[in-house]
Structures are given as structure tokens and as C-alpha cells.
Regions:
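Cys/His-coordinated zinc-binding microdomains
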Residues: 42
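N-terminal [4Fe-4S]-dependent radical SAM core
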Residues: 1-37, 45-68, 73, 77-79, ...
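Conserved SAM/AdoMet-binding glycine-rich loop
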Residues: 77-149
Length: 149
């Protein structure tokens, strides 16, 4: 096996971004599900219920105290450093039942993720979305994990 030198012309794991859209994951802070604990959910005290602390995204989120701004900013920098395109981002929000979190927290997670993509802090989510239309790092897709339980 030989070592490769990774540069912006030779991204690590190019399959991840071959379509031109780069996935970026933000993890919600841990919260017990309103319906109780499912048999198949391994979660612990410091992780969202449906995840273990071994997942790279969870480890990054834990290290950043689940701050959506920091998760987005740091991951964006890392993806750029690895040579992935960062102009078109698919924002993936993980962590269980999104709709069971307070509405203010839901808006805050999305807004702060947009703030990091925009490189500046907006007054509200609407302003953050508007700025993102012309940002260097545009959110072109958003996937919010939600369990039907």
C-alpha cells in the first residue's frame, strides 16, 4: 500500500463529494425521547439516543459541546483542508426526534448552522437564509433526521 499526498486536487474519499455537493453533519444535543427508550437505541448519557459515542460525527459534536455553529464551522474547514468542494453543502441534522426538541432550539440549530456557512451572525433565521443565497458556502439541501415514534 502506498501513501497519497492529499491536496485540493486530490481529495480524501472523493466519492463523498463526486456529485459536487458536500454532506456536512450537525448533531443535536442529547435528549431522552418523549416516548421512552427503544430497545434498538444504544444511546447513552452523553450521546443522542439513537447513536453511540463511536461515530465520527458524534465524537466531533461531543468535543464541541454539541454547538451547531462550531460543528459546522470546524467541519467546513476540515472538508476544505481535505480538498472537498465547500461551495454547495447538504446540511444533515442528526440526533433523533428533531420535532421533540423545543421549537426555539430547532430554529437555533438551523440558524447557527447557516451563520457558520455564511461566516457572519444573522439576527434571525430568515436573514441567515437570505444571506446564504449568495454565500461562499451555500446550503443546497437539508436533511433533518426525525423518528416517527
Amino acid at each position: 500500500m502506498h501513501n497519497k499526498i492529499y491536496s485540493s486536487d486530490n481529495p480524501k474519499k472523493p466519492v463523498r463529494t463526486i456529485s459536487g455537493v458536500t454532506p456536512l453533519t450537525v448533531v443535536l444535543k442529547p435528549k431522552k425521547c418523549d416516548h421512552g427508550t427503544c430497545i434498538y437505541c444504544p444511546g447513552g448519557e452523553y450521546t443522542p439516543q439513537s447513536y453511540t459515542d463511536k461515530s465520527p460525527a458524534i465524537m466531533r459534536a461531543m468535543a464541541l459541546d454539541y454547538d451547531p455553529y462550531q460543528q459546522t464551522k470546524i467541519r467546513l474547514e476540515n472538508l476544505h483542508r481535505m480538498g472537498h468542494p465547500t461551495d454547495k453543502i447538504e446540511l444533515i441534522i442528526l440526533g433523533g426526534t428533531f420535532l421533540q426538541y423545543p421549537l426555539d432550539y430547532q430554529y437555533d440549530v438551523i440558524k447557527r448552522s447557516f451563520d457558520a456557512l455564511n461566516g457572519r451572525i444573522a439576527k434571525n433565521l430568515e436573514e441567515a437564509k437570505k444571506w446564504n443565497e449568495t454565500s461562499e458556502h451555500r446550503c443546497v439541501a437539508m436533511c433533518i433526521e426525525n423518528r416517527p415514534d
